[in-house]
A protein has these predicted regions:
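Acidic/His-rich structured neighborhood in mature extracellular/periplasmic domains
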Residues: 64-228, 240
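Positively charged n-region of N-terminal signal peptides that target proteins for export
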Residues: 1-4
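Soluble non-cytosolic domains of exported or imported proteins
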Residues: 32-35, 44, 48-62, 121-125, ...
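Pan-zinc metallopeptidase signature
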Residues: 233-360
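Bacterial Sec signal peptide processing site at the extreme N-terminus
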Residues: 16-39
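Sec-exported extracytoplasmic/periplasmic mature domains
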Residues: 46-50, 63-73, 180-184, 201-213, ...
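Bacterial N-terminal signal peptides
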Residues: 6-16
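Acidic/histidine-rich, surface-exposed loop or edge segments in extracytoplasmic proteins
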Residues: 35-52, 107-116, 289-290, 307
Length: 360
């Protein structure tokens, strides 16, 4: 509890306003809720009353930690050695927002991490109230549930009930994603951080499946990643079309009408994709949900630079030590230079790699 109290006091003493104090108060309470009531996984596994499925997932967690250490060259520290049941579906509800006629996400400033493109709440109602206030100001908003988050080394992150029942590959993906944040996180660049973690997670799962579950499971996962990549590309096209519209010389009323047409066209393309192959069936859900600047921006944060990191991984001869070393070098550059280099790698990715992680 002491680190939580210290963190809250630091915020209170920094001269922030009432709304900010209220926000960090709920954040401190929420983090405390995650910290208290944790159980050691090594002790839980010994309990003969523990369901076999849960025991298996805990054993898998320990296995993934070692795989991350030995094969992915990321130190797991003391993360994922404990379990916490929060008795709810998500640990956080995350709010994204963007202006009505811009694809650029709103940002919020936080201690330590700097500017970030989302606002997280431990109570769903709080997130939706905050989103409603932004909507009243004319913003596009999107609220999404998060099963996990990284405390970036301030605390040891536990396994949570919010993702314990995930299928193996999804579970491993989440663990590797969050450990990637522990390994490398830079301030003021959410797209770099999340795209890097997404790439590492997919690379890690592909390697883990090939080593531990066989080539069939590995290939099925790669096919799934390729479908995800196709969806991301389609959504990126829609977002880019909106960006061109917003940057045009058209009037605001013309832009609003154009926005409706672009989103309608995007939804039609999503339906077409969902009907093109049984593997894309779930894409139909995207066509039914409200699509706006905030939703497309949130998706972009997690996927925009993923192809660039895949290309860098390939150029590193799939050597994780070399790959991570190169990423760390890029991370130390100024944002403009960093983006330029990643854009070059993205071009290489499009030219050479058909699958997002081509590991045959």
């Amino acid at each position: 509890m002491k680190p939580v109290v210290f963190f809250l006091l630091a915020v209170l003493l920094s001269g922030t306003g009432c709304q900010t104090i209220s926000y960090y108060t709920q954040a401190a309470k929420g983090q405390a809720q995650v910290l208290f009531g944790q159980q050691r996984i090594c002790e839980m596994i010994k309990d003969p009353k523990l369901p076999e499925e849960l025991k298996g997932k805990f054993q898998l967690t320990l296995e993934l930690r070692e795989f991350a250490r030995n094969e992915l060259k990321m130190n797991p520290g003391n993360n994922y050695l404990k379990y916490r049941n929060l008795n709810r579906k998500y640990v956080l509800w995350v709010v994204y927002a963007a202006p009505e006629l811009s694809v650029k996400l709103e940002t919020w400033w936080y201690p330590i991490v700097g500017e970030f493109t989302s606002r997280g709440f431990f109570v769903e109602q709080d997130a939706r109230k905050y989103a409603a206030r932004l909507q009243e100001k004319g913003k596009d908003v999107f609220v999404g549930g998060a099963p996990a988050y990284s405390t970036l080394g301030w605390f040891n992150d536990p396994v949570l009930n919010t993702f314990i029942n995930y299928p193996e590959a999804d579970f491993a993906e989440l663990i590797f994603h969050e450990l990637a944040h522990h390994h490398l996180f830079i301030s003021d660049d959410a797209t770099f951080n999340e795209s890097f973690a997404t790439a590492v997670a997919q690379i890690g799962v592909a390697r883990w499946l090939k080593s531990n579950r066989g080539i069939e499971q590995h290939d099925l996962y790669l096919a799934r990643c390729a479908r995800r990549h196709t969806l991301s590309e389609l959504l990126a096209v829609g977002r880019n079309n909106l960006k061109k519209l917003y940057n045009s010389n058209k009037s605001e009323s013309e832009k609003r009408e154009g926005k409706k047409k672009v989103i309608t066209s995007l939804k039609m393309d999503l339906v077409t994709l969902s009907e093109s192959d049984p593997g894309y069936r779930k894409v139909a859900v995207w066509a039914k949900r409200p699509i706006n600047n905030a939703l497309l921006g949130a998706r972009s944060v997690y996927h925009r630079r993923v192809p660039a990191f895949f290309a860098l991984y390939e150029e590193s001869n799939r050597d994780m030590e070399v790959f991570l070393s190169e990423v760390e070098k890029i991370s130390r550059l100024k944002k403009k230079k960093r983006d330029s280099i990643l854009a070059e790698y993205e071009t290489k990715s499009r030219a050479k790699i058909n699958s997002p992680i081509n590991q045959n």
